[in-house]
Amino acid sequence: MLILVRYGEIGLKSKSVRRRFEKKLISNIEDAFLRNKTECRITSDWGRIYVYTENIDKGVNVLKNIFGIVSLSPAIETSSELDDICVSSVDYSKKIIKKGQSFAVRSRRTGSHHYSSMDVAVKIGNAILNSIKNVSVNLDAPDAEIFIEVRNNRAYVFSEKILGPGGMPLGTQGKVAAFICDEKSVVAAWLMMKRGGYVIPVYEESNRNAAHYLKILEDWNNLVKPFVVKSDEVSEQVQEIEKFSRKNNAIAIVLGFDEFKKINSTLPLFFPLIGMDNEEIKTLWKKIIFEQ
């Protein structure tokens, strides 16, 4: 089996930018698998990335935390010959569709073929009905769905779409320093990561929860060594962070709170949480923790 990976915003870019961002996303996937001591082989097609790995469950857990991935599906691969698709789909469906359940076949194609997407759905649907007892077709609210994606000379069969975090691949935008002090600041840093920012964590030496917050972010990003702020006075903290940022080519400071709004800074200050109320921030925090 393999894992079919889909991306979103990358597809809206020009060809050259899209190619560069896709290459970065593949590199991020390889790094994530390496960190998790899991082997993989990766190929790509226009709009899709294919991750081949022996450990599908672990692969899914790795991929669902990689920015730039909109969704992913564990899938089986076969040729685009309609008879081959039919055999593979029926074998696969026997593991997915239970006795007494309803099902639907959803198909789509890319490339030139002697059959239509509807032909695929009808043929596979009939084959499943003839192979599995006591099942029925329900296109509106099925108990199980069988998806078939035909892309040129290959076809992929799967039954679920697992959501990823979306956004842009980590590292495709500028480097920023994120001041980590509480849950809000973690959410702010996470949002910058989702936009492709290369985030360097900064925290106060006296913050006892810093290690906990950093661990949460590390599961979303292979963070570089964090910077420790010695001072506990806001204006001096800003100066320390600015000095560190320039030395490390960070173009801005990311904050999850507004105390620094009253402080003059020679670097841009980013407040990703502006426009979000406390309930929205709490919901996003729970999502980050849950997925992590």
Predicted regions and their residues:
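Low-complexity, intrinsically disordered short peptide segments enriched in small/polar/basic residues
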Residues: 1, 183, 221, 231, ...
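RNA-binding accessory domains that recognize and position tRNA/RNA substrates
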Residues: 1-225, 246, 289-292
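A short acidic, often aromatic-flanked loop/helix-cap motif at beta-alpha or helix-coil junctions
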Residues: 78-83, 144-146, 232-239, 276-281
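Short, surface-exposed amphipathic charged segments that create phosphate/polyanion-binding patches used
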Residues: 89, 238-244, 279-289
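Conserved adenosine/adenylate-binding substructure
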Residues: 224-271, 290-292
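Short, flexible loop segments at boundaries between secondary-structure elements
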Residues: 265-287
